[in-house]
Amino acid sequence: MDGQPFTYTGLSFFNAIYNPAFNKSSEERIRWLEKFQKYGINVLRVWAQWDSRRGYADTCPECTVYFTDGRLRQPHVETLKQILVDAGKQKMAVELVFFSQESWHDNIRVGPEESARAITALSKELLPYRNVMFQVWNEFDERTLDHVKTMRAADPKRLVTNSPGGAGVVYYARGQGEALDYLTPHTTRQRTGRHWEIAPKELSYLLERYGKPVVDDEPARNGTPNFGGPAEKTYPSDQMIQIYKVWRLGAYITYHHDMIQTGYGTPAVPPSGVPDPEFSPYHRAVFEFIALRDRYSR
């Protein structure tokens, strides 16, 4: 960041733009950012499109930074800018997911011309904000290279990536892996087996093949079996072992969790809707390990 080496350490905070508690004020937002930093987090993975019908915390039909005709929803764009300003003050960054396969499969879709219009408009709005990376899709690959070209035309220096598919989909279509600045696959989860052994091998393959930074972008998590979650009980050590192995590879991590999927009023979701590192003993244990990255990653 700012021309200096940056050890990417992310957190899933998909609903950040649309969360009332996080956006109550700049002071409140910075309080949360400082708490994330305390536990080693320096990147938030945030979704521009949060309008699926799956009942996640803070989803709604208007919860997207663009209309389906490609025009921007300016109030949400302004909130995103405020997040970027406050994150920048803390030397933090945002990975912004443009399009969601969840919305696509709910038949909430943006056409080719409309998506190009939205990408171009938002890219130009965010030109002054250099602490945001663009991720084309969450777990999908539809016209990805076209979208990358549109992003680069509007902002040639912006870092761009893509998540090509769900758990275990770590291959990139021809030309895509080469075109991206860094790679963000969603590695194997519990249903395939011992993810803490399999996922690092998947990342190692990508590092060797493409020779560019790789982030374990949305790895196996705890909680509900829905939406790609585990069918059996999980333990904090499951995540810790995988994180440790990813670090030792020279790759980077994002902590993925169950603090959004089941919606407000359920035991897994904090009342604030913010992924609070101290919300449960399970999460706190993993976050405390992440905070010790310098100790264990060498």
Explain the meaning of each model-derived region.
Residues 2-180, 186-189, 193:
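Active-site mouth of glycoside hydrolases
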Residues 117, 130-288:
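Extracellular glycoside hydrolase catalytic/binding regions
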Residues 285-298:
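Terminal, non-catalytic domain-edge segments
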